[in-house]
């Protein structure tokens, strides 16, 4: 396949400034890398943080964001075997762009925790461009029966919430409270939870998000902006008023992280996934100990988690709710995201 020398991309020139739609050189893959012609890229709240530069994690600048890219392999390095990727294969570029594959973390299938990991759209350029590079070992193969536009959100949001649900330890028939249920991660978390046999309580705000959550199978929707007592409402929605077996925190504000231990049941798990800037997670030591509450973080997923998350979609168990928009509209999408006005996920159409 012929590859041009230049391409269109959304480039953040300086942290805190909106991306600029401009032409940049097309990167060339290294020996162990693939070059993917992007068809679609999801827009994640992480991309907004990368633009703002408000995380305690240095990013490259200028930066091409994005880490939910789905497309077709158009070039590859000499070390990439055909059984891994051939020219023309469908491929996904995820948040974890590459890792060393030889440290203790990588050896025990915790590649996201690799101290040498490269992160798409953060420490290396990501998927808000026509052509993106990724390490072949970490890229995802997208099944032929999964549409590329629908696959894009699965590559980060889907994998992340699927991993978080596994980390929660919740078993079929048990109840999971999903905080931020109406967003891109939350809309997928509800579906993965249902497919895993879990019952869900959706916590978010707004009529549009309520309608979407109910359509996705939430047994109860709690609007935190209208509720006089979120803790009491969650408990009231569970058998015996004992609280949720697990809480999945996808929120981008600090308060839900302080509140979750109040409505998780004894011996339950609070799983922190959302990353509000400059926030802290606090809980009373006495209550946490005597109620045996498990508080943990869950960070994206490893290669096998990615395979499993895509397989759920391929088997028709997940329907990613998303809206399409052209790559040129990214700044406006960031504005809506910052205002909390997006239900589901936006997927960018990358120009040919």
Curated annotation (Swiss-Prot):
It catalyses: a primary alcohol + NAD(+) = an aldehyde + NADH + H(+); a secondary alcohol + NAD(+) = a ketone + NADH + H(+). Homotetramer. Its cofactor is Zn(2+). CDD domains: CAD3. This is Alcohol dehydrogenase 3. Its main location: cytoplasm. One of its GO terms (cellular component) is cytoplasm. InterPro entries: ADH-like_C (IPR013149), ADH-like_N (IPR013154), ADH_Zn_CS (IPR002328), GroES-like_sf (IPR011032), NAD(P)-bd_dom_sf (IPR036291), PKS_ER (IPR020843). Zn(2+) 1 binds at residues 44, 67, 156. Keywords: Cytoplasm, Metal-binding, NAD, Oxidoreductase, Zinc. Binds 2 Zn(2+) ions per subunit. Gene3D superfamilies: Medium-chain alcohol dehydrogenases, catalytic domain, NAD(P)-binding Rossmann-like Domain. Zn(2+) 2 binds at residues 100, 103, 106, 114. Its EC number is 1.1.1.1. NAD(+) binds at residues 180-186, 204, 209, 273-275, 345. The gene is alcC. Belongs to the zinc-containing alcohol dehydrogenase family. The lineage of its organism: Eukaryota, Fungi, Dikarya, Ascomycota, Pezizomycotina. It is found in: Cytoplasm. GO terms for molecular function: alcohol dehydrogenase (NAD+) activity; zinc ion binding.
């Amino acid at each position: 396949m012929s590859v041009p020398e230049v391409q269109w991309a959304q480039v953040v020139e300086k942290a805190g400034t909106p991306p600029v739609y401009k032409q940049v050189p097309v990167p060339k893959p290294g020996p162990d890398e693939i070059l993917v012609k992007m068809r679609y890229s999801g827009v994640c709240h992480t991309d907004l943080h990368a633009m703002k530069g408000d995380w305690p994690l240095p990013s490259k600048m200028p930066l091409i964001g994005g880490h939910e890219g789905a497309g077709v392999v158009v070039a590859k390095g000499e070390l990439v075997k055909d059984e891994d990727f051939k020219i023309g294969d469908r491929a996904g570029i995820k948040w974890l762009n590459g890792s060393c594959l030889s440290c203790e973390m990588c050896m025990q299938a915790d590649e996201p925790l690799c101290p040498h990991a490269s992160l798409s759209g953060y420490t290396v350029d990501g998927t808000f461009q026509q052509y993106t590079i990724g390490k072949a070992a970490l890229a995802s193969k997208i099944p032929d029966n999964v549409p590329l536009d629908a696959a894009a959100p699965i590559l980060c949001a889907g994998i992340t919430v699927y991993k978080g649900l596994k980390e929660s330890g919740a078993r079929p028939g048990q109840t999971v409270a999903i905080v931020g249920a109406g967003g891109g991660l939350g809309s997928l978390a509800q579906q993965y939870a249902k497919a895993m046999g879990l019952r869900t309580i959706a916590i978010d705000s707004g009529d549009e998000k309520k309608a979407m959550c109910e359509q996705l199978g939430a047994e109860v929707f709690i609007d935190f902006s209208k509720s006089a007592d979120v803790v009491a409402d969650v408990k009231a929605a569970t058998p015996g008023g004992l609280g949720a077996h697990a809480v999945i925190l996808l929120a981008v504000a600090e308060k839900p992280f302080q509140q979750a231990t109040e409505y998780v049941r004894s011996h339950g798990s609070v799983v922190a996934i959302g990353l509000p800037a400059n926030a802290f997670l606090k809980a009373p030591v006495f209550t946490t100990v005597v109620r045996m509450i498990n508080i943990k973080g869950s960070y994206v997923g490893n290669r096998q988690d990615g395979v499993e998350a895509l397989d759920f979609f391929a088997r028709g168990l997940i329907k990613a709710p998303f809206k399409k928009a052209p790559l040129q509209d990214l700044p406006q999408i960031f504005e809506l995201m910052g205002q909390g006005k997006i239900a589901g996920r936006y997927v960018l159409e990358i120009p040919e």
